[in-house]
Structures are given as structure tokens and as C-alpha cells.
């Protein structure tokens, strides 16, 4: 994760980070189900292990926001999204058969879900945990790598995400 609020060298930093992530995605074949589960499990553990720190960071960004509100509206839905994704991931990865026109018989057609490589996520300030982890969960489930840009209006949460990444 890039945690920059200055525009001075941010393009260079982003280009370097993207180059590393893109190169890694090109050298790795499509992530297996086990690898995707490992990434999702790591994200789940990160969220559970740092729940208090995340609530404190969000509260600092908002001036004060109730820990209960952050848990109820950001952390618990993120954990539920991770659980749902892990439960259905194997089915989502399977090829889907599609009908073939009579003209192309005896051919077969199917859609094979494949990762695209690197996903950029630009996160808003109002629900910084939930609105970052939802797309990040989807990117990891699809087998992609991701770059996450947190809002400059949530600096404490962005700094914590950068530390934990």
C-alpha cells in the first residue's frame, strides 16, 4: 500500500509500486484455490487481530466515532464478506458451460474466470475500512494483486493500513 499525501514524488512511487506488482502478477500463474484462500485468511486475521487499532484510527480521523459504530458498520460486514467469499470461491472459480450455435456443433464453449493482474482501489474517506476491504476481498478472490490508495481525509487509518500491509 502506498501512503502518500504529497504530490511531489507520488507518481514515481506509484509507478515503482505498480511495476513491482505487475511484474509479480506476470510471473505467477493464476492463483490456485489454496493460494486465494491463504490471502483471504491473512486479510481476515489482519482484521481480527487489529480490530481495536482500526477502531481507534477511524475514531482519530473522524474526531470521534464510536467503536461500536465502526465495528457494526465496517468491521463486521467486512468479516462477513470474507466469510461469504471463502465459502463460495471454489464454485466461482469453476468454468461455466455456454450453449453453442448449431452451426458450430460439435464444438463446446465455456467461460473460464482468470485474474487480470493488478487492481487499483481508490478508497473514499467516509467508511475507510469497509470500502477498502470489500474491493480488496474481491480482488484477492479473483486471484489478482492490488494497489490500495487511501483517502487523504483519513490519515490515521491510511497510516495503520500502510503499517499492517
Region roles according to the model:
Residues 100-165:
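Rossmann-like NAD(P) dinucleotide-binding subdomain of oxidoreductase/dehydrogenase enzymes
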Residues 1-110:
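N-terminal Rossmann-like NAD(P)+-binding subdomain of aldehyde/semialdehyde dehydrogenases
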Amino acid at each position: 500500500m502506498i501512503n502518500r499525501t504529497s504530490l511531489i514524488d507520488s507518481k514515481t512511487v506509484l509507478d515503482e509500486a505498480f511495476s513491482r506488482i505487475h511484474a509479480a502478477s506476470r510471473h505467477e500463474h493464476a492463483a490456485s484455490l489454496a493460494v486465494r484462500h491463504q490471502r483471504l485468511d491473512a486479510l481476515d486475521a489482519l482484521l481480527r487481530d487489529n480490530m481495536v487499532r482500526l477502531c481507534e484510527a477511524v475514531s482519530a480521523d473522524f474526531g470521534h466515532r464510536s467503536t461500536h459504530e465502526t465495528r457494526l458498520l465496517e468491521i463486521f460486514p467486512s468479516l462477513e464478506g470474507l466469510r461469504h467469499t471463502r465459502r463460495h470461491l471454489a464454485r466461482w472459480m469453476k468454468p461455466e458451460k455456454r450453449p453453442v450455435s448449431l452451426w458450430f456443433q460439435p464444438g463446446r464453449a465455456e467461460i473460464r474466470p482468470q485474474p487480470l493482474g493488478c487492481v487499483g482501489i481508490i478508497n473514499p474517506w467516509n467508511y475507510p475500512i469497509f470500502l477498502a476491504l470489500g474491493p480488496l476481498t474481491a480482488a484477492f478472490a479473483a486471484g489478482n494483486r492490488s494497489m490500495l490508495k487511501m483517502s487523504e481525509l483519513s490519515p490515521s487509518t491510511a497510516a495503520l493500513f500502510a503499517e499492517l500491509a
